[in-house]
């Protein structure tokens, strides 16, 4: 069965522009990359993380002082892939604004919260979900025990990241993330995942300018 995300990406429209050298065509995402807009869409996994990290690094090299916009619509995914994106966002010099359109769940919510303070946004009907990491393991008892210790360590680290970016206490984060916790845009703002709910482009431009 085909992955619906792969099917959708195969139908990406092309944009044709006139230049001094004639016509040049771009897929729509490459054209938006010229405007310093990156899309993080679908499950967070290694290949997607590599593409997002590469785009962040490319835009930094192109202009280290101009902000980058990261649009997020993701159900989450692999923690290590998400942390690769997170670390790259923190590593590069440009400020990275984040905008949730659709959903930002699990690792998607962490990356949404990790945007530049004051530049983390969601559209009015966006949904955000936070929870603790999960995993299933098979094998010898000693191997399962090691995996369990590792996932507990990972849980602590993710909690620390949420504390850093939301302003919540560790106790509040641990309690909220104990189970799947769904939020609308207003609740996400109150919890500290985002700074502002956007209804228009002008609102985003005004917030970034400030």
Swiss-Prot record:
Give the positions the UniProt entry annotates as the active site: 106, 131
Q: Tell me the GO molecular function terms.
A: ATP-dependent peptidase activity; ATPase binding; serine-type endopeptidase activity
Q: Which UniProt keywords apply?
A: Cytoplasm, Hydrolase, Protease, Serine protease
What are the recorded Gene Ontology BP terms?
A: protein quality control for misfolded or incompletely synthesized proteins
GO cellular component terms attached to this protein's record: cytoplasm; endopeptidase Clp complex
Substrates-to-products reaction catalysed: Hydrolysis of proteins to small peptides in the presence of ATP and magnesium. alpha-casein is the usual test substrate. In the absence of ATP, only oligopeptides shorter than five residues are hydrolyzed (such as succinyl-Leu-Tyr-|-NHMec, and Leu-Tyr-Leu-|-Tyr-Trp, in which cleavage of the -Tyr-|-Leu- and -Tyr-|-Trp bonds also occurs)
Record's CDD domains?
A: S14_ClpP_2
- Enzyme Commission number, as recorded: 3.4.21.92
Location comes to:
Cytoplasm
Q: Which InterPro entries does the annotation name?
A: ClpP, ClpP/crotonase-like_dom_sf, ClpP/TepA, ClpP_His_AS, ClpP_Ser_AS
Oligomeric form and interacting partners: Fourteen ClpP subunits assemble into 2 heptameric rings which stack back to back to give a disk-like structure with a central cavity, resembling the structure of eukaryotic proteasomes.
* Physiological role: Cleaves peptides in various proteins in a process that requires ATP hydrolysis. Has a chymotrypsin-like activity. Plays a major role in the degradation of misfolded proteins.
Stated family: Belongs to the peptidase S14 family.
What name is this protein filed under?
ATP-dependent Clp protease proteolytic subunit 2
Q: Which organism is it from?
A: Agrobacterium fabrum (strain C58 / ATCC 33970) (Agrobacterium tumefaciens (strain C58))
What lineage does UniProt assign to this protein's organism? Bacteria, Pseudomonadati, Pseudomonadota, Alphaproteobacteria, Hyphomicrobiales
